[in-house]
Amino acid sequence: MQQNHESLLFQLSSVEVGQHYYWNIGSFQVHAQVLITSWFVLGLLLGIALIATRKLETIPNTTQNFIEYVLEFIRDLTRTQIGEEEYRSWIPFVGTLFLFIFVSNWSGALIPWKVIELPNGELAAPTNDINTTVALALLTSVAYFYAGLNKKGLSYFGKYIQPTPVLLPINILEDFTKPLSLSFRLFGNILADELVVAVLVSLVPLVIPVPMMFLGLFTSGIQALIFATLAGAYIGESLEGHH
């Protein structure tokens, strides 16, 4: 029995970076483990939304109270970053980013993905994969370009020569560094957190990993908040037309 427990602990603490389980779709290879965990997170969010909105009451119950609190938090976050006049249409986008990243990060800390065996690689939080974080960052880039072009038309590109045309290369470079910083910050923090916990579980499996897991949950929440806040700030900058 003790041997079985030790085997399970070492399985949970095994560290594999760069190992992937692929699905072949036509001539393309996709990272199956990222899709599996992403679908799980999306399904969980949809399930919670359906349960919370199935029977709305004038005097809300505990679940409805919690959902309303989350929505108010997202609304206030979006309004603070984008502004009173424009924020309403961007609540769904910023809210979806925040909730997906938050639940993805927490799933990596709370769910023992490594127990589920794959032919190759291992399951982990969706945000533990650089492809996911880059995709989220690119979506944010598309969103703030769309926001600026939709409001200002082609005159939006005039921001690149403000306050002087000399800054044109730097202003263009800034639009490339924004998604890079968003994606690598999120990916690096989540990967580092899971690696630290995995190493500590393998060294001291019973005591030290517990406070580290709580710290990881806190850090995961902060990273989701930072990503959503910066996404809202970038959209707000595009709508205002200045940096």
From Swiss-Prot:
GO terms for molecular function: proton-transporting ATP synthase activity, rotational mechanism. Pfam families: ATP-synt_A. Keywords: ATP synthesis, CF(0), Chloroplast, Hydrogen ion transport, Ion transport, Membrane, Plastid, Thylakoid, Transmembrane, Transmembrane helix, Transport. The chain crosses the membrane at residues 32-52, 91-111, 130-150, 195-215, 216-236. It is found in: Plastid, Chloroplast thylakoid membrane. PANTHER family: ATP SYNTHASE SUBUNIT A, CHLOROPLASTIC. Belongs to the ATPase A chain family. F-type ATPases have 2 components, CF(1) - the catalytic core - and CF(0) - the membrane proton channel. CF(1) has five subunits: alpha(3), beta(3), gamma(1), delta(1), epsilon(1). CF(0) has four main subunits: a, b, b' and c. This is ATP synthase subunit a, chloroplastic. The gene is atpI.
